[in-house]
Regions:
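Terminal domain-initiation and capping elements
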Residues: 1-111
Length: 111
């Protein structure tokens, strides 16, 4: 199996685990969006909490040029570290949510 296919499976496994642990109320739908053709993966919550609209993307991960890009993380989880524990090389992870000038000081790939 090539690296891209492996990364797709690992990302989906990780996000599925996070989604299963989400304890949002019944009026809010927890969604796992997996576009395996374009390699975009998101954990979303959509719905209503009383009179307030809930529309949140908690984690957004892309695969670009053979690298995993963590685009957003509004959780207390560390998906980059979890992916490393699952076998992804640190140099194959880009913290896209960090500005480019900060990335050289991170333990992951710059871009």
């Amino acid at each position: 199996m090539d690296k891209r296919m492996t990364y797709r499976e690992l990302i989906q496994t990780l996000l599925s685990r996070y989604v299963e642990e989400d304890v949002t109320d019944e009026a809010v739908e927890v969604q796992l969006l997996c576009d395996t053709q374009r390699d975009h993966y998101q954990w979303m919550n959509v719905g209503w909490k009383g009179m307030k609209r809930v529309y949140s993307c908690f984690i957004h991960i892309d695969i670009k040029d053979g690298k995993i890009w963590l685009q957003q993380n509004w959780t207390e989880e560390d998906p980059a570290a979890a992916l490393v524990e699952m076998g992804v090389l640190r140099e194959d992870i880009v913290l896209g949510l960090q500005p480019p000038y900060k990335r050289p000081y991170m333990d992951y790939r710059v871009a």
